[in-house]
Amino acid sequence: MTHAPHSEVAQHVAEAAADHADSGVFPPFDPTYFASQLFWLTIAFVILYIALDRLILPKIKTTIEDRRDRIADDLDAAAQAKADAEAAGEAYEKSLAEARNKAHALAAKTRQTLDAEIAKETAAVEAELSAKQEASEAAIRKAKDKAFAEVRGIAATATAAVVSALAGVEVSEADAGKTVDGLIKAKEA
């Protein structure tokens, strides 16, 4: 029993092969099978279309939308980062300008303070030097006056001695001093 169906199938295949061999046309290009081939081709394309439409295309569409959203989010994040960087740069420039202005103001204030201290110290030193100069000039005048007084006394004594030695006349030191004083006043004028 098992051999009977096998032999029937084999016989049927052999008959079909003989029919085809007699026609001389390649079976897929045989016009008698076109209707059947078109039917199965249509069914295969419908199944392929449904599979693409229901399974594959939604996944591709979702992937493309996710990628587009991710790119848009990345662009938004980049724009935000750029805006933040620009704001930080502006804040840095502003704080740098403020620090520079504060430094200039502090330098000017310090310069004014130092100039005032220097002027004060200079005035004190000048006053001290002026006082020392006046004291020195007074000491010099005193020494000069003392020296002149001594020179006057010596000149008066010398004059009295010279007149006495040369003229043989005795002159008092007081008279000789008056003569020396007159000569000194005449020379100063």
From Swiss-Prot:
InterPro entries: ATP_synth_b/b'su_bac/chlpt, ATP_synthase_B_chain
Keywords in alphabetical order: ATP synthesis, Cell inner membrane, Cell membrane, CF(0), Hydrogen ion transport, Ion transport, Membrane, Transmembrane, Transmembrane helix, Transport
Gene3D superfamilies the UniProt entry points to: 6.10.250.1580
GO molecular function, one term: proton-transporting ATPase activity, rotational mechanism
Membrane disposition: Single-pass membrane protein
Localization per Swiss-Prot or TrEMBL: Cell inner membrane
CDD domains per the UniProt record, alphabetical: ATP-synt_Fo_b
Signal peptide: none
Main localization of the protein described in the UniProt heading: membrane
Transmembrane region(s): 32-52
GO CC aspect terms: plasma membrane; proton-transporting ATP synthase complex
Subunit structure, interactors included: F-type ATPases have 2 components, F(1) - the catalytic core - and F(0) - the membrane proton channel. F(1) has five subunits: alpha(3), beta(3), gamma(1), delta(1), epsilon(1). F(0) has three main subunits: a(1), b(2) and c(10-14). The alpha and beta chains form an alternating ring which encloses part of the gamma chain. F(1) is attached to F(0) by a central stalk formed by the gamma and epsilon chains, while a peripheral stalk is formed by the delta and b chains.
Function: F(1)F(0) ATP synthase produces ATP from ADP in the presence of a proton or sodium gradient. F-type ATPases consist of two structural domains, F(1) containing the extramembraneous catalytic core and F(0) containing the membrane proton channel, linked together by a central stalk and a peripheral stalk. During catalysis, ATP synthesis in the catalytic domain of F(1) is coupled via a rotary mechanism of the central stalk subunits to proton translocation. Component of the F(0) channel, it forms part of the peripheral stalk, linking F(1) to F(0).
Family membership noted in the UniProt record: Belongs to the ATPase B chain family.
PANTHER family the record matches: ATP SYNTHASE SUBUNIT B, ATP SYNTHASE SUBUNIT B', CHLOROPLASTIC
Protein name: ATP synthase subunit b 1
